[in-house]
Regions:
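Structural motif
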Residues: 1, 20-23, 50-53, 83-84, ...
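Surface-exposed amphipathic alpha-helices with a cationic face
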Residues: 16, 99-106
């Protein structure tokens, strides 16, 4: 299992506890760098017999799975009684697949992506230009390149959040709601609150 060094030690220990071999790679290198987790995972898959390289950044099964499962689950559990769907943006699979399904069911609904400061999605959505990404601590969302699994056709707005906002919201959810979650969940909720406030809702 290959992961960047900004991932929490708890995740690494949990994987090792169930027998996984974990290879930790540096975060602050370009995707093309041979030390990046993209490059290392691809190399290990090529060198390992019977290995499967999921390639979640360019595998159409990623958004398709969310189209077939996550979208219908949200629709069934809410009975379509919602106006906005908010999700963190990492590989783009969740927001692309789920957003596509929900917009087919309810075209007027709004899909909001949440992006950490340091990632390039926010600037790309607003300007159409790729900017240079820089480091951030939130795990699991944000990107320093454009995966083919990210389709902005299904995204209506992108909200930018700071590391502090993500961590603070994750702690708030644990303390006040009893929801044991990580920073990317905190990011999504912080982004949802920001969007609601932008729309004039008091939170």
């Amino acid at each position: 299992f290959i992961m960047p060094d900004k991932m929490s030690m708890e995740k690494i220990k949990a994987l090792r506890a169930v027998g996984a071999k974990v290879v930790v790679t540096p975060t602050d290198v370009e995707p093309e760098d041979p030390r990046s987790y993209y490059s290392v995972s691809r190399r290990i898959a090529e060198e390992t017999p019977n290995a499967f390289y999921a390639n979640q950044y360019h595998n159409p099964s990623n958004p398709e799975t969310h189209y077939k499962t996550t979208g219908p689950e949200i629709w069934e559990q809410t009975q379509g009684d919602f106006d906005v769907f908010v999700a963190g943006m990492g590989t783009g699979g969740t927001i692309t697949g789920t957003g596509r399904y929900l917009k087919e069911k309810k075209p007027e609904m709004i899909t909001v992506g949440v992006d950490p400061v340091g990632s390039l999605y926010y600037d790309y959505f607003k300007t159409g230009k790729l900017t240079e990404a820089h480091s951030y601590k939130v795990e699991g969302i944000g990107e320093d390149f454009l995966p083919s699994t990210m389709n902005f056709e299904y995204v209506d707005e992108v909200i930018r959040v700071t590391d502090k906002e993500c961590f603070d919201m994750a702690r708030r959810l644990v303390r006040h709601e009893g929801v044991l979650c990580g920073q990317s969940c905190g990011a999504s909720v912080a982004g949802a609150v920001k969007y609601a406030e932008m729309m004039g809702r008091k939170m």
